[in-house]
Amino acid sequence: MELGGPGAPPPPLLPPLLLLLGAGFLPASSPVETRAHAEERLLKTLFSGYNKWSRPVANISDVVLVHFGLSIAQLIDVDEKNQMMTTNVWVKQEWYDYKLRWDPADYENVTSIRIPSELIWRPDIVLYNNADGDFAITHLTKAHLFHDGRVQWTPPAIYKSSCSIDVTFFPFDQQNCTMKFGSWTYDKAKIDLVSMQSHVDQLGLWESGEWVIVDAAGTYNTRKYECCAEVYPDITYAFVIRRLPLFYTINLIVPCLLISCLTVLVFYLPSDCGEKVTLCISVLLSLTVFLLLITEIIPSTSLVIPLIGEYLLFTMVFVTLSIVITVFVLNVHHRSPRTHTMPAWVRRVFLDVVPRLLLMKRPSVVKDNCRRLIESMHKVASAPGFWPEPEGEPGVVSGERSRGPSRSASFRGPRDEPAEPQPACASPSDRVPAPQPSEGDPGSPCPLPDSCRPPPSTRAPGLTEARSLSFQHVSSAAERVEGGVRCRSWSIQGCAPQDEAASVAGGPVTSSPAFPKASAAELLPPDQPSPCRCRCRKEPSPNAVRKACGTRVPARHLPLSPALARAVEGVQYIADHLKAEDTDFSVKEDWKYVAMVIDRIFLWVFVIVCLLGTAGLFLPPWLAGMI
């Protein structure tokens, strides 16, 4: 059967329907795929015949305006020794390229694309004051291209810029570091810079633990260099950064202040303890070790001396002077009359004037210990119950004490006394003298020789005070019956010339601490009668008392036994020795007090200097507004 003939069935409608259905159910191309194809077509269109080496200007005389900005991400380090600042920044650059324009309607409404920055023209902006590394940007990120020809490029960079570090007020210093950006090839007639912002963007800044950015302002400058006749523009950002001083205050300043305080305490330490020089040397050694540790902390620059370096030098001189002064004070402290003689001006200045100015009061102690001992002995000897009395007999005063400035008891034998002048005997007593008979008194059973009448205060010129010793003897009952008079005491007196007494250590006469015990038989030989018979109980008349107080007795008329002479010599030696020791002790105490006054002077001087040095450390940075 022929197709299309009469009576033939109509052709099937399946293929056209299938075609229609297939055309209706076919997926249309996605917008992303369409945009990708549009960007691909756009890139092919833009870069066909594009030359990245030529400036993007339609006229050769036109200027490419590059908008420049800076955003800092982190202040990495400030190297005071090498004088450079390391920063992590984003360099913002924006310019127009007329060869990279298109109509978004022709390319599926594509308004911007990201393209590799190596494919387009870029301004050769570098960091002028680069200290280490590359001057230009090394990491070339993609640029953002807009349909109107605007190009935005923000590559990150780590710069090490040169920075003039001024460590005068270290660690309270504030630095001013700059970063200078500009075109290295094109002058102002080809490329001009326009600042995006007047300050550095710090929104994404990572805070540093040592520095804080106070200010970061950018300024536009033009400069004509010696190499070229053209004028070159640049944008300079000035970073004002301030150091955080907490670390250096704890680890540097506080130890220095404590060492200075230890140096001051050296002058408060007593010299007798023997640790003054040890403390000084210990402080000096600790300061030396401390200086070895902080050499890595202090900026090692020779342009200026840091303030903390000056303070450390001041502390070192401080400690050294304290050692020198301590040695001098110890020398003064250990002086004695056998090695040094104290000048009058030293005694006047350091024992009288300076202590009053320093409000120092010396304790009023009795220096003559031997004199106090003898005075106490005299008080005991003068007590009413000291001398024994027989029964039924009233007590008779027989103890004699010298009223002179030196209350001492001593003896001088015939071999010790000079021939001339003749000394006068004096035996004053604190009590009423015992009754003594006179020659004119017929009722006196016991006549008193003229040689036994001691005057109370008579003394020949050029003589020392009389020294007397009384010995007590109680008569027996047979003696009282035979003689009729009870003799109780004998008094032996002797004097020494003034020139002989003055030759003993040149000081006041000191007292002997003890008397030798002797009986009446040892005082005088048995075959020689005593010139002084006894003291009688009869009350004397006023004339007899006056005569007894005015009679002079030569010392050579008083004979001494050998045992008593040896005892007297021993007592005299002990008295002279104690007197010399007491004099030496007094002078030594004066030297020690002079040393203490010198210590107190330098204590206040060093305290004032330490306070002034500490104020000098903190005051200049505070006045400069850095604290």
UniProtKB/Swiss-Prot annotation:
* Residues modified as Phosphoserine: S427, S541
Gene Ontology molecular function: acetylcholine receptor activity; acetylcholine-gated monoatomic cation-selective channel activity
Compartment annotation = Synaptic cell membrane; Cell membrane
Sites carrying sugar chains: N59, N109, N176
Lipid-conjugated positions (S-palmitoyl cysteine): C273
Q: How does it sit in the membrane?
A: Multi-pass membrane protein
Reported function: Component of neuronal acetylcholine receptors (nAChRs) that function as pentameric, ligand-gated cation channels with high calcium permeability among other activities. nAChRs are excitatory neurotrasnmitter receptors formed by a collection of nAChR subunits known to mediate synaptic transmission in the nervous system and the neuromuscular junction. Each nAchR subunit confers differential attributes to channel properties, including activation, deactivation and desensitization kinetics, pH sensitivity, cation permeability, and binding to allosteric modulators.
* Name of this protein: Neuronal acetylcholine receptor subunit alpha-4
Species of provenance: Mustela putorius furo (European domestic ferret)
What does the organism's lineage look like at the top?
A: Eukaryota, Metazoa, Chordata, Craniata, Vertebrata
